Design a protein with these regions (language model features):
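Bacterial N-terminal signal peptides that target proteins for export
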Residues: 1-8
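N-terminal, intrinsically disordered, polar/charged segments of Gram-positive cell-envelope systems
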Residues: 9, 13-15, 19-53
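An alpha-helical, amphipathic repeat domain used for nucleic-acid recognition
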Residues: 36-195
Length: 195
């Protein structure tokens, strides 16, 4: 059971890292733009400073929510910091969680072709990104582009990898338990699938 849980948690972290992480080019660009000298406060225990450093990396590189950063810092399958060090990191982390949610949401749309509703669900899910409702809504309101192409790419994936009929694809695209695209987005996808 413990091994299965480790594998599940590891897979969840990898999925989130892939979906929400920044490309190397973006990191290089952001690093050049944000060169800031920080003086390390030696009155703060090294363990606390290490937790803060890890938290900064999770925020800047993986665009994690406050709760996911805390969970990763304290997880026995993660960084294993004590709760005091993790709380210090959270309290002293200078992060824009709206922007983290936005970058994470943009990556879900771009790489996984998710609908607005699925992105929102993933961003707020307790087994997903754990952003607040307000942060997730900020992301949804600011993700650029329409969702017609995302629906089409998702439909093509179902057609090619699962050999589904157009009716089954439409149902999957619009299902509350599936992709959660709007009827208009799903119909666009069906109308533009290869024959």
């Amino acid at each position: 059971m413990k091994k299965g849980l480790k594998v599940f948690l590891g897979a969840a972290i990898v999925l989130s890292a892939v979906a929400c992480s920044t490309s190397n080019d973006e990191v290089k660009k952001e690093t050049k733009e944000k060169v800031v000298e920080t003086k390390e406060d030696t009155s703060v225990p090294k363990e606390y400073r290490n937790a803060l450093h890890k938290a900064e990396n999770y925020s800047k590189m993986m665009h994690m929510s406050k709760q996911r950063i805390y969970d990763q810092l304290t997880s026995k399958y993660g960084d294993q910091f004590d709760v005091e060090a993790a709380q210090y990191a959270i309290d002293n982390l200078n992060a824009d969680y709206n922007e983290n949610a936005l970058k994470c949401g943009e990556n879900y749309k771009k790489t996984m072709h998710m609908s607005k509703a699925r992105i929102y669900d993933q961003l707020t899910s307790e087994s997903g990104e754990k952003f607040t409702a307000e942060q997730a809504q900020y992301a949804i309101d600011n993700i650029k582009g329409d969702y017609l192409e995302a629906a089409l790419k998702s439909a093509k994936n179902y057609q090619e990898t699962m050999s589904m009929s157009k009716d089954a694809i439409y149902d999957q695209l619009t299902s509350e338990y599936g992709e959660k695209f709007t009827a208009e987005e799903a119909q666009y996808a069906i109308d533009n699938l290869d024959e």
